[in-house]
Curated annotation (Swiss-Prot):
It comes from the Bacteria. GTP 2 binds at residues 183-190, 230-234, 295-298. GTP 1 binds at residues 10-17, 57-61, 120-123. Belongs to the TRAFAC class TrmE-Era-EngA-EngB-Septin-like GTPase superfamily. EngA (Der) GTPase family. GO terms for molecular function: ATP hydrolysis activity; GTP binding; ribosome binding. The keyword Repeat applies. Residues 353-437 form the KH-like domain. Keywords: GTP-binding, Nucleotide-binding, Repeat, Ribosome biogenesis. GO terms for biological process: ribosome biogenesis. InterPro entries: AAA+_ATPase, G_ENGA, GTP-bd, GTPase_Der, KH_dom-like, KH_dom-like_a/b, P-loop_NTPase, Small_GTP-bd. GTPase that plays an essential role in the late steps of ribosome biogenesis. Residues 4-168, 177-352 form the EngA-type G domain. This is GTPase Der.
Length: 440
């Protein structure tokens, strides 16, 4: 089920990023030391009162070009508001009403999206004259908060979850494998989808972002049900210019949330970009199975070592996705495109694979004997038992004497041992540590 998307919009320096960090800061688990994932905190999942949503911070997208402030705010807000399910308009109560605030508010009113007006930087809640001018924005009662101090943010979240659309399930058969095709504009996503489907169901043009929107295409192959979620409409050339291209991420987030398998499509000529890392990182953190598809391979000049060099470079840039199979393709020539669905089936199977508890514990014992767990000041970590606690992605619960002694590098070692013994290619693996209690 896709999470609703909430966009935080407003002119620069009103506290958007502070509010973003306040909402997600204590509700997002980030593994210390995990390499490679780009964490610019542009977007993050959050939860309140049992409702999950994806929060998007426009603070990192303020224009650094020579554009006027209001022009920059307009472009950011139009994209964020169009793609979001709900909007938080943040204004600066200290600075008072500003033409930039009025500009964003007018866009929200025209879009008819659920919106909450957040008057930030309110220090004294017994004297609120400073927020009265914001009623002129036509978005209802301004909610006074202090994002820096956390004041009234609980009330803000209560009102926000009331605005979110009702939860609903996808209408496809439960056994259908949902495949998200993600990547930057013009990397060849639609052409690859057309070849997979064997027919022209998706509009294709050489102009980035010509697909009208994210398109679901159910189909059957070899007796199995699939749904391809094509996000080729990440950017509309007539509406969005290059500085705001990052907002294609919002559609990718939705597609990833709904998917079982993610095809991360890269441009072989341009290589891995920051946006590629962001979107791939979200797929990894969401626990999805994945295949890295390097398209336009026909445009690369090659010698006998080219593929090895490219593989090494991509593995370095997307180190957090080290488990994903890598496929070099050309939608223009059809080379290796036929292998995509083979890999989809394979990684989907690994994503939902279970291994026996005796087999898992035997492997853990051997791994511990080969390389003992870390210790600290005479205390040594002991792993007494292990069990697989879930699938999609595979999750392993380790019962230990002292969870605080576990180091990320040792978990990576155990992950490598599990992968070597059982496979799990194409899927992330999660670990949960449980303290072993002494029996009475």
């Amino acid at each position: 089920m896709p999470k609703p998307v909430v966009a935080i919009v407003g002119r620069p320096n009103v506290g958007k990023s502070t509010l973003f960090n306040r909402i997600v800061g204590n509700r997002v688990a980030i593994v210390e030391g995990e390499p490679g994932v780009t964490r610019d905190r542009l977007y993050q999942d959050a939860e309140w009162s049992g409702r999950s949503f994806t929060l998007v911070d426009t603070g990192g997208l303020d224009f650094k070009e020579s554009d006027e402030i209001i022009q920059g705010v307009r472009r950011q807000a139009e994209i964020a508001i169009r793609e979001a399910d709900a909007v938080l308009l943040v204004v600066d109560a200290k600075a008072g009403l500003n033409p930039g605030d009025e500009e964003v508010a007018s866009i929200i009113r025209r879009a008819e999206k659920p919106a909450l007006l957040v008057a930030n930087k309110v220090e004294k809640f017994d004297s609120l004259e400073q927020i009265y001018d914001f009623y002129r924005l036509g978005l209802g009662d301004p909610l006074p908060v202090s994002a820096a101090e956390g004041l009234n943010t609980g009330d803000l979240l209560d009102r926000l979850v009331e605005m979110l659309p009702p939860e609903k399930e996808d209408e496809y058969p439960p056994e259908a494998i949902k495949i998200a095709v993600i990547g930057r504009p013009n990397v060849g996503k639609s052409s690859l989808v057309n070849l997979i489907l064997g027919e022209e169901r998706v509009i294709v043009s050489n102009v980035p972002g010509t697909t009208r929107d994210a398109i679901d295409t159910p189909f059957e192959a070899n007796g199995r049900h699939y749904v391809i979620i094509d996000t080729a409409g990440m950017r509309r050339k007539s509406r969005i210019d290059r500085p705001t291209e990052k907002y294609g991420v919002i559609r990718a987030l939705r597609a990833i949330d709904r998917s079982d398998v993610v095809l991360v499509v890269l441009d072989a000529v341009e290589g891995v970009t920051d946006q590629d890392k962001r979107i791939a990182g979200y797929a990894h953190e969401a626990g999805k199975a994945s295949v890295i598809v390097v398209n336009k391979w026909d445009l690369v000049e090659k010698d006998g070592h080219t593929m090895n060099r490219y593989t090494e470079k991509i593995r370095e840039e997307l180190a957090f996705m080290h488990y994903s199979p890598l496929l070099f393709t050309s939608a223009a020539t059809g080379k290796r495109v036929g292998k995509i669905m083979e890999l989809v089936d394979m990684v989907a199977g690994r994503h939902s694979m279970r291994i026996s508890t005796p087999g898992l514990n035997a492997l853990i014992r051997e791994a511990v004997l080969r390389t003992p767990p870390p210790s600290d000041k005479g205390r040594r970590l002991k792993i007494t038992y292990a069990v697989q606690g879930g699938i999609k992605p595979p999750k392993f619960v380790l019962f230990v004497n002292a969870p605080d002694l576990m180091h990320f590098s040792y978990l990576r070692y155990l992950e490598n041992q599990i992968r070597a013994a059982f496979g799990f290619e194409g899927t992330p693996i999660r670990f949960v540590l449980r303290k072993k209690t002494k029996e009475a």
